[in-house]
UniProtKB/Swiss-Prot annotation:
PROSITE patterns: HSP90. One of its GO terms (molecular function) is ATP-dependent protein folding chaperone. Residues 559-630 are annotated as: C. It comes from Bordetella avium (strain 197N). Homodimer. HAMAP family: HSP90. This is Chaperone protein HtpG. Keywords: ATP-binding, Chaperone, Cytoplasm, Nucleotide-binding, Stress response. Belongs to the heat shock protein 90 family. The gene is htpG. Its main location: cytoplasm. Molecular chaperone. Has ATPase activity. Pfam families: HATPase_c_3, HSP90. One of its GO terms (cellular component) is cytoplasm.
Length: 630
């Protein structure tokens, strides 16, 4: 670092250097977004000034007409984006223009692949903002003066690793960003081109975006710039317009502004709500999940305005957590202009907005599920696990959310999660009054579970679940439309409804005839198991393990252990298949080998369940010894 009384040269934060390099190489095909980002920043600066001026009206003194001015100089090869907003202090310039102060930075960089198209999407999700200047500029200068201060600063950088910051003179508050264009970026030194980009990307900005008028000079045979300024955008907030006045393309472009991305939204809803709370909402469901969807500290929520005055960017209190992927704007007519995050947590109006917005998004998803099934499949693949959280978090909408859930199923025969609970009910067997499911660590483990054998034999559908959130969700979703949801891995599973009279009679007889073997197995396995018993739920497997009806499932126990949680000891119940050849073999084994066979039976049942056995080396040694005797 070098410095004197008024200037210093500092190094960019390492992550900024990396982002600049990636951005210049990955976003070049989307280079026009630099203008969108800089105009958006200028608009935000004006919004922040308007907000601070609520308590300090003197900040607007002498210059209350907020606007953004875009100009270019062909001779100097520069583009300038100027605003009369809040401005930057020296400390703010260093913090905002030299570092990335947000969570999820490390996770963002870890997900980059080297594929320009995929990385461009990730960079868009992360938010490039000011740094997009360097896509088209080889040097950027920022002249800024904070509202309420007489001191100004000049920030400069070539984007190569360092930036300088020095004291400067500026007659008015606000910020001027000057881009010194690269040699091959002459297309932006054109008034028509700049207007076209501004109208495409920033027409919805509520502030006027001004450019100098241009006229054709016949004598000079060229366009000439006049001193008079003209507004090039509509200069009213998109969400305040009537839906009939807004094209789908305008909705899509506005989404790209609020999401800072390049992808198209999957769907949106735009409504004006009147009643106990009056507000306008324009909410979007993205097509792709953000890289930090599971980061607890990630920025989430929608932009909050009050009477068209910007209040905050990430008002997460306006939507329930399970809809944290939603982007957009909510403009309230009832909240106070000086609203804080603390007030948001306690406000009755906010609760009304949150409940109303949740219902709107659920209606939007219901429409997708019913009328745009391919789009809903995309949504489910990206956000299905998050939506499942709503089953427990939003009891008032639980039934609606349950109808939106999608599962893999033995009916489909593959891992695609396309079966709804209503689909399942439509395929119930005669006399079936339960919805059966199995949970596991993966689709493969679920679809190959021995617990499915009797259900496959009888043609009864079973839902296959392996997402980490599933066990928690199922603890809140006990029934659907009067039918209980039942795990096929629970020992208390009542299979009587699935058996005919002959099978019930056979089950009673078998249980009696196998009592001696059951007692031998119980003695040999001792405290390792809660119980040993005969079952008719198995067809191809010799044995399986189950847990009590009120015990935690093996799958949930494994997840809790992996998370470092203390878990209660749950002894499994070993169930044996009386018709399997291995069980017949074990009945005749001598006492000398019986203990080894009993342990092998339990270990392979645990492995089939996806559990870890206590001593893998002993298992292999025992298996090899018994194989030599076969």
């Amino acid at each position: 670092m070098t410095q004197n009384a008024t200037s210093e040269t500092l190094g960019f934060q390492a992550e900024v250097k990396q982002l600049l390099h990636l951005m210049i190489h990955s976003l070049y095909s989307n280079k026009e977004i630099f203008l969108r980002e800089l105009v958006s920043n200028a608009s935000d600066a004006c919004d922040k000034l308007r907000f601070e001026a609520i308590d300090q009206p003197e900040l607007l003194a002498g210059d209350s007409e907020l606007a953004i001015r875009v100009s270019y100089d062909k001779a100097a090869r520069t583009i300038t984006i100027a605003d009369n907003g809040i401005g930057l202090s020296r400390e703010e310039a260093i913090a905002n223009l030299g570092t990335i102060a947000r969570s999820g930075t490390r996770e963002f960089f870890s997900q980059l692949t080297g594929d320009k198209q995929k990385d461009a999407q990730l960079i868009g999700q992360f938010g490039v903002g000011f740094y997009s200047s360097f896509i088209v500029a080889d040097r950027v200068s920022v002249l800024s003066r904070r509202a309420g201060s007489d001191e100004a600063i000049r920030w400069e950088s070539d984007g190569q690793g360092e930036f300088s910051i020095a004291s400067a003179e500026k007659a008015t508050r606000g910020t001027d960003v000057v881009l010194h264009l690269r040699a091959d970026e002459d297309e932006f030194l054109n008034g028509w081109k700049l207007r076209e980009v501004l109208r495409r990307y920033s027409d919805h900005i509520s502030l006027p975006i001004l450019m100098r008028k241009e006229e054709w000079d016949a004598d000079k045979d060229e366009q000439v710039t006049r001193d008079e300024w003209e507004t090039v955008n509509q200069a009213n907030a998109l969400w305040t317009r009537s839906k009939s006045e807004i094209s789908d393309e305008q909705y899509r472009e506005f989404y790209k502004t609020v999401s800072h991305g390049f992808d198209e939204p999957l769907a949106w809803t735009h409504n004006r709500v009147e009643g106990r709370s009056e507000y306008t909402q324009l909410l979007y469901v993205p097509r792709q999940a953000p890289f930090d969807l599971w980061d607890r500290d990630a920025r989430r929520g929608v932009k909050l305005y009050v009477k068209r005055v910007f209040i905050m960017d990430d008002a997460e209190q306006l939507l329930p957590a399970y809809l944290r992927f939603v982007r957009g704007v909510i403009d309230s007519a009832d909240l106070p202009l000086n609203v804080s995050r603390e007030i948001l947590q306690e406000s009755r109006d906010v609760r009304a907005i949150r409940e109303g917005s949740a219902k709107r998004i659920l209606s939007l998803l219901e429409d997708l599920a019913e009328n745009r099934k391919d789009d809903y499949a995309v949504f489910w693949g990206e956000f299905g696990q998050v939506l499942k959280e709503g089953v427990g978090e939003d009891p008032s909408n639980q039934e609606r959310i349950a109808k939106l859930l999608r599962f893999a199923s033995t009916h489909a025969g593959d891992a695609s999660q396309t079966t709804s609970l209503q689909d399942y009910l439509g395929r119930l067997k005669e006399g079936q009054d339960k919805i059966y499911y199995v949970t596991a660590d993966s689709y493969s483990a679920a679809s190959n579970s021995p617990h499915l054998e009797i259900f496959r034999k009888k043609g009864i559908e079973v839902l296959l679940l392996w997402d980490r959130v599933d066990e928690w969700m199922l603890s809140h979703l006990r029934e659907f439309e009067g039918k209980s949801l039942v795990s096929v891995a629970k020992g208390g599973l009542d299979l009587a409804d699935l058996a005919d009279e002959e099978e019930k009679k056979k089950q009673t007889e078998v249980a009696e005839s196998f009592k001696p073997l059951i007692e031998r197995l119980q003695t040999a396995l001792g405290e390792q198991v809660k119980e040993v018993r005969v079952t008719l739920r198995l067809v191809d497997s010799p044995a399986c393990v189950v847990v009590g009806q009120n015990d935690l499932s093996p799958h949930l126990l494994r997840m809790l252990k992996a998370a470092g949680q203390e878990v209660p000891e749950v002894k499994p119940v070993l169930e044996i298949n009386p018709e399997h050849a291995l069980i017949a073999r074990i009945r005749d084994v001598s006492d000398a080998d019986f203990g080894a066979w009993a342990q092998l039976l339990l270990d392979q049942a645990l492995l089939a369940e996806g559990a870890q056995i206590a001593d893998p080396a002993a298992f292999v040694k025992r298996l090899n010894a018994l194989l030599l005797k076969v």
